Amino acid sequence: MAEKVSEDVMLLHGDLDLKIVKARRLPNMDMFSEHLRRLFTACNACARPTDTDDVDPRDKGEFGDKNIRSHRKVITSDPYVTVVVPQATLARTRVLKNSQEPLWDEKFNISIAHPFAYLEFQVKDDDVFGAQIIGTAKIPVRDIASGERISGWFPVLGASGKPPKAETAIFIDMKFTPFDQIHSYRCGIAGDPERRGVRRTYFPVRKGSQVRLYQDAHVMDGTLPAIGLDNGKVYEHGKCWEDICYAISEAHHMIYIVGWSIFHKIKLVRETKVPRDKDMTLGELLKYKSQEGVRVLLLVWDDKTSHDKFGIKTPGVMGTHDEETRKFFKHSSVICVLSPRYASSKLGLFKQQASPSSSIYIMTVVGTLFTHHQKCVLVDTQAVGNNRKVTAFIGGLDLCDGRYDTPEHRILHDLDTVFKDDFHNPTFPAGTKAPRQPWHDLHCRIDGPAAYDVLINFEQRWRKATRWKEFSLRLKGKTHWQDDALIRIGRISWILSPVFKFLKDGTSIIPEDDPCVWVSKEDDPENWHVQIFRSIDSGSVKGFPKYEDEAEAQHLECAKRLVVDKSIQTAYIQTIRSAQHFIYIENQYFLGSSYAWPSYRDAGADNLIPMELALKIVSKIRAKERFAVYVVIPLWPEGDPKSGPVQEILYWQSQTMQMMYDVIAKELKAVQSDAHPLDYLNFYCLGKREQLPDDMPATNGSVVSDSYNFQRFMIYVHAKGMIVDDEYVLMGSANINQRSMAGTKDTEIAMGAYQPNHTWAHKGRHPRGQVYGYRMSLWAEHLGKTGDEFVEPSDLECLKKVNTISEENWKRFIDPKFSELQGHLIKYPLQVDVDGKVSPLPDYETFPDVGGKIIGAHSMALPDTLTT
């Protein structure tokens, strides 16, 4: 799709197949360095010529290294190319050392949803003190939008408008395809007749799987209504932490846990009729299993702001308990590794200083600002006969304090029983009398081939983390580290496993889909296809290919000296483009596509997800088809809503909303529709009002919050999931923001899954499989009821019914007099007019009880990379 925005600017929406081949006659940008080299080597003219480069032979220039045997290598430019549109970088080649005739020969498949006049190819020289622009080649958007192949030499011009040298140019080959002409987007991911899942990802789609979907940490029997499915089945509500506890208890060989936070004091089982393991903490359970001979490995994010040395304890900014958990397991057979979010070891100090928003980006910033955010539990479980298999749990739930909750989301009840020693509400200072912060999340269990892909992720990260640990111990004069702790499951005959292979350089070879680890047959009505996605780079894994052509073959991106897997964003883009009826999102954050914001377009939050959602709606408006997008987010990000970081995140969020409604309103006017933008896109949050229990202790001497007095508080939406057309579910640890989607910032893991026998394509009608049951179960929790009026989310009548309930709930939530809500769903407290203008509700510019602007405020004191 190509839409004219102004005389020169067009908005392109589709895929760009691009090949950056080579450049010619680049200038020597390192002349000063070359003069220094000659000065220092003048006295050693007879020295034996050597090749001092540590460069991959594939990274030589167009003429290779034919002169290297007779002459010392001349220091010259280290060129690379960035592909940019205004306020967004679309692609970046690797750096080629010392070459004025570089041959990159790199291919890119770029998802585009950007307005621009020219596509720019900036040729840069990588330097120890930062990159220098050699020059830029520009291709007009009109030429690209034609869809014709563009191939040839394009002049590289400097800032003066002239080439730095005569005939300086870059050779480019490209072709743009509008998204509505791409066949794979027409059927939906689940309805693809080729069943290839999301294309161009590191892990392929896996067949023969089983998935169990969870809402919240626990669901008590009878608290949610029965939901009928196809074939006479009834949706079964899972008990997440109880299932995880049972799986850990029954493990025979391995328990691997990855977390942003893992707290040894939490209890997984609290409200159950089965007494088993009810009184045992997570730490006690893991020690017990390790004493049975089970290999227990914990990989926890190392928060660099927390410390426990020389008797001085600093809990850290994020309060993850990492040092406390490490200390608890220190003298046990449980191996607990704290893993910092290091940048790539291939980046030098100055290479890590370059940042879109700040030149002061020292090496420690990566480890301080960004995190390991994945949440995974891997255990061996019972398979067919006497065999064992690998089972994975992934999603948004860390095994730590504040996460246990149920669909009731109590805020004042059971604080001394169910939530004893587990009170969590960071909105208020310690000691304040306040409601607990209820926690809503999504999680899942995976059995089958995809669970082994989660295992590959763990092993790649473990090898990298223990490599850093080994280096640290050597610096301290120690020589041993238990770096061979991973179970070699391929050597244990009764543990079913595909064949894992590695190249000599340690590169992981992703195994083919192996029927030996299938847990269901393809003709089984309850069969699942599952695919694993990640946001991660070579600074956090050991096993990525070292060469560009191998990375390209594994659908990884090369960015200067990094190899990047950003398949979570790829999955979101392709799934949104493939949606046919509706999209339902729950996410802790919602911001992106900053290149199209009304203000601060250079914030760097250039993930495509919000723009893709808006353009999906636009495409349906043009086709005169119904489509609806529902987005559930927290009322405010966790913490004090008056604080600078929270206010800035809220500001980015409101900028994102405004951009989306602008796009939709403009299209409605273009087709002369009298529809309202809210007929297509709506934002919601969750809240709770609960009367004080009769046995609540007196508040004598305590600072009492208004939230406590009014008996209300938001339900914190920590979920990271998307349901499309009731046939495809995408969930994991990734937020919808730049930190989670970039691949070079927070590390994330997610899964996309569907039942091939429960799709629109297979049924010829609205499917009612497990994904449908999951969405209806979530809506039953949020809306306080279920029924036929919620079966078709794309219908305008359904959308208006949801809005009626959510708007009434907002009125009840803010009423000074206690009034119980119907469910928990609340219309997000911003108003949108027919022109798409987003503004605060009259008399409610700040959050009730706690303050802070609902629309947020920009802060000049914070780096944008922290809050985007």
Swiss-Prot record:
Cellular component GO terms held in the UniProt record? plant cell papilla; plant-type vacuole; plasma membrane; plasmodesma
| Enzyme Commission numbers on file | 3.1.4.4
Task: Specify one Pfam family.
Answer: PLD_C
The annotated topology with respect to the bilayer is:
Peripheral membrane protein
What domain of life is recorded for the organism? Eukaryota
Keywords on record: Calcium, Cell membrane, Hydrolase, Lipid degradation, Lipid metabolism, Membrane, Metal-binding, Repeat, Stress response
* Residues reported to bind a 1,2-diacyl-sn-glycero-3-phosphate: 373, 588, 718
Record SUPFAM superfamilies: C2 domain (Calcium/lipid-binding domain, CaLB) (SSF49562), Phospholipase D/nuclease (SSF56024)
Compartment annotation: Cell membrane
UniProt keyword annotation of Aminoacyl-tRNA synthetase present = no
Say if the entry is tagged with keyword Amino-acid biosynthesis.
no
The residues annotated as the active site are 373, 375, 380, 718, 720, 725
Q: Which residues form the C2 domain?
A: 1-154
The conditions that induce or repress this protein are given as: By salt stress or dehydration, in vascular tissues of roots, cotyledons and leaves. Not induced cold stress. Up-regulated by abscisic acid in rosette leaves.
Quick one: a GO biological-process term for this protein?
A: positive regulation of abscisic acid-activated signaling pathway
Q: How is the cofactor bound?
A: Ca(2+). Requires millimolar level (PIP2-dependent).
Q: What class of enzyme is it?
A: hydrolase
User: Which tissues and organs express this gene's product?
Assistant: Expressed in roots, leaves, stems, siliques and flowers. Strongly expressed in the vascular tissues of cotyledons and leaves under dehydration stress conditions. Expression is higher in old leaves than in young leaves. Expressed in leaves and guard cells. The isoform 2 may not be present in siliques.
What cofactor does its activity depend on? Ca(2+)
How this protein's activity responds to pH is stated as:
Optimum pH is between 6.0 and 7.0.
Reactions mediated catalytically? a 1,2-diacyl-sn-glycero-3-phosphocholine + H2O = a 1,2-diacyl-sn-glycero-3-phosphate + choline + H(+)
Family label: Belongs to the phospholipase D family. C2-PLD subfamily.
Q: What does this protein do?
A: Hydrolyzes glycerol-phospholipids at the terminal phosphodiesteric bond to generate phosphatidic acids (PA). May be involved in PA accumulation in the dehydration stress response and in the transduction of hormonal and environmental signals to the microtubules cytoskeleton. Prefers phosphatidylethanolamine to phosphatidylcholine as substrate. Involved in H(2)O(2) and abscisic acid (ABA)-induced stomatal closure. Involved in nitric oxide (NO) signaling during stomatal closure. Plays a positive role in ABA-promoted senescence. Involved in basal defense and nonhost resistance.
Complexes and interactors: Interacts with GAPC1 and GAPC2. Increased interaction in the presence of H(2)O(2).
| Protein known as | Phospholipase D delta
Organism, as annotated: Arabidopsis thaliana
Q: What is the lineage of its organism?
A: Eukaryota, Viridiplantae, Streptophyta, Embryophyta, Tracheophyta
What gene makes this protein? PLDDELTA
